[in-house]
Design a protein with these regions (language model features):
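Short linear capping/connector segments at secondary-structure termini
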Residues: 23-31
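CBM-like carbohydrate-recognition segments
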Residues: 34-35, 39-124
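Long, well-ordered core segments of solenoidal/helical folds
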Residues: 4-23, 64-81
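A surface/extracellular/periplasmic glyco- and lipid-processing/surface-interacting theme
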Residues: 1
Length: 124
């Protein structure tokens, strides 16, 4: 129950940080940072699963998910590569470190979360 409550709090807080383009920034709590697609896809996946499991309110989260998914597929090129994927990152308390990270189009750790989303959408 405690884990589910933490999950709901996280999903609720993500609502406040969704950027105008529909996705989330490299620093989630700063909408001025560049859009990061792999993390955004993970958030979409978590929201879709939450709605389908009955943990999240569909009327609240479906519009966010729809906006994010439409934005996310706009980052997939003709070869199926996804842009805006942050290179592998260790953790630090230095915000600038995260802002200076490079993006790697086609990076496989960006592909997987998008495939998770597709799978979640297709599940009944």
């Amino acid at each position: 129950e405690r884990i589910l409550e933490s999950y709901r709090r996280m999903m609720n807080s993500l609502r406040d940080y969704q950027k105008e383009d529909g996705l989330w920034g490299q620093l989630v709590d700063d909408k001025t940072t560049w859009t990061e697609t792999s993390g955004s896809a993970m958030f979409v996946y978590a929201m879709v699963k939450g709605v389908k499991k009955g943990w999240l309110d569909e009327a609240t989260y479906a519009p966010l998910v729809r906006k994010a998914w439409i934005a996310l597929i706009g980052h997939i090129d003709e070869n199926g590569d996804i842009d805006g994927v942050c290179e592998g990152t260790n953790k630090t308390n230095d915000r600038q470190f995260y802002l200076n990270r490079k993006t790697l189009p086609g990076n496989m750790h960006g592909q997987a979360p998008v495939l998770w989303c597709v799978n979640a959408f297709l599940e009944k």
